[in-house]
Amino acid sequence: LSLISGIFKNADYTMERLVRVAKKLRLEHNFNGYIHLKSIPGASDELMREAGLYADRLSMNLEIPTESGLKLLAPDKNHQDMIKPMGFVKNELIQYKEEKKKFRSTPKFAPAGQSTQVIVGATQENDFQIIQVADHFYKNFDLKRVYYSGYVPISNDARLPAIGAQVPLVRENRLYQADWLMRFYGFQANEILDKNNPFLDLEVDPKMSWALRNITQFPVIIQNASLELILRVPGIGVKSAHKIVMARRFQNLSLEHLKKIGVAINRARYFISVSGENSHLKFLNALNLKEIIVADTKSKFENPFSNQLSLLHDDSFLR
């Protein structure tokens, strides 16, 4: 259940009513399900604290990723109004966890943590800027998730994309994949993109793009490579990587073994050395390796501006 509201009268007035609804659901209607409450920028600390006692997750949506973009569209707003509550919630989460260790009766506070959302494509930020922002909030505010939403043109404002402009859904999806790499695959933001490569490749996923730019790190010898290195092989997901580490203790692994484990062989085979023949390694240093892989791999999104987007953002994108 998501509790969301536009601001009316003022921040505290609106936030108080959101908290009242969450409290009523919990105490009067005995609702024990998941509640995600979108906090109101500028609301008091007291209301933020009370919200965390009744909601499973709190979110403060950043919306526009950079201060310059926000100033362009909303000169009267600033990121600090959104960042300050995130800092408060982070400190409250730490405090309640410490109290819980001492007193079992301590109530839960936002047990599912906090999240934020950024709009993609409304202003001129590149993907490098966006994932740097996400990385900052993950590291400094202990966010559980950053959500990315492609901008849907609904206004004739000249500062925004024109009505009828395509929604960049593949770009949105690539950002989710890059986010997944940072959270679960051990990638740093500045490894995925940099100032010389500020946009994510729409033809291949971010892990494949990284591999193609760092071809000297391959092939990975599956039989003795570290888990961290195996996780960087295109086509190998987190679960498959752990299965590989376990399985190789008992036998030398071939492409057929990896396929049974769940590895996406059509991508991984260009980057790994295994027991038995792997004829695809001959393409590793080919100048047109990307074209070979793209031609050999049916894209999940044939049109980068498709009107349909999968709701699943998991490591199946990056296997």
Region roles according to the model:
Residues 81-89, 121-206, 220:
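A structural motif corresponding to the C-terminal lobe/cap of the Radical SAM core domain
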Residues 200-229, 255-319:
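C-terminal extensions
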Residues 1-116, 120-124, 137, 155, ...:
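Conserved Radical SAM active-site core
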Residues 247-248:
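Residue-level signature of tetratricopeptide-repeat
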